[in-house]
C-alpha cells in the first residue's frame, strides 16, 4: 500500500508556481488517461506515486480543478490566507465534513 504525504482538506502549495490549493481527493497512483510523452505523468516513477485532485484559484479568483503529482506539492504552513479566503473556507468545510460525516438514508 502506498502512503500519501497529504490528506483531503489539507492546504498545499504548488512547488514550482507557488499557488495555494486545497486537496479534495487522493489517488494512490496516476489514474487518468495515458499521458502524452511530454507530460510530467509520462514519468513511470511519478505515475506510481500518489496524485492529488487540488482546487486552486485562477488569476480572477475562480476555482480551478488540477491534478498534480505528490512531487509537485509542498505543505502549506499558514492556516489563514487573507488574499484567498475562499480556499481557507473550502479547507475548513472539508475538514469539518470529514470529522462529522452525515448519515445518508
Swiss-Prot record:
Keyword rRNA-binding belongs to the record: no
InterPro entries recorded: Hemimethylated_DNA-bd_dom (IPR011722), Hemimethylated_DNA-bd_sf (IPR036623), HspQ (IPR022866)
Gene3D superfamilies: Hemimethylated DNA-binding domain
Intracellular or extracellular location(s): Cytoplasm
Keywords attached to this entry: Cytoplasm, Stress response
Function: Involved in the degradation of certain denaturated proteins, including DnaA, during heat shock stress.
Name of the featured protein: Heat shock protein HspQ
Source species of the chain: Klebsiella pneumoniae subsp. pneumoniae (strain ATCC 700721 / MGH 78578)
Source taxonomy: Bacteria, Pseudomonadati, Pseudomonadota, Gammaproteobacteria, Enterobacterales
Amino acid at each position: 500500500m502506498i502512503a500519501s504525504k497529504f490528506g483531503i482538506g489539507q492546504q498545499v502549495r504548488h512547488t514550482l508556481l507557488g499557488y495555494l490549493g486545497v486537496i479534495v481527493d487522493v489517488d494512490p497512483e496516476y489514474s487518468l488517461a495515458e499521458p502524452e510523452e511530454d507530460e510530467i505523468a509520462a514519468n513511470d516513477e511519478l505515475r506510481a506515486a500518489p496524485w492529488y485532485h487540488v482546487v486552486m484559484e485562477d488569476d480572477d479568483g475562480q476555482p480551478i480543478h488540477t491534478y498534480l503529482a505528490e512531487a509537485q506539492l509542498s505543505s502549506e504552513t499558514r492556516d489563514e490566507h487573507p488574499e484567498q479566503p475562499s480556499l481557507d473556507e473550502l479547507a475548513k468545510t472539508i475538514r469539518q465534513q470529514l470529522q462529522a460525516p452525515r448519515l445518508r438514508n
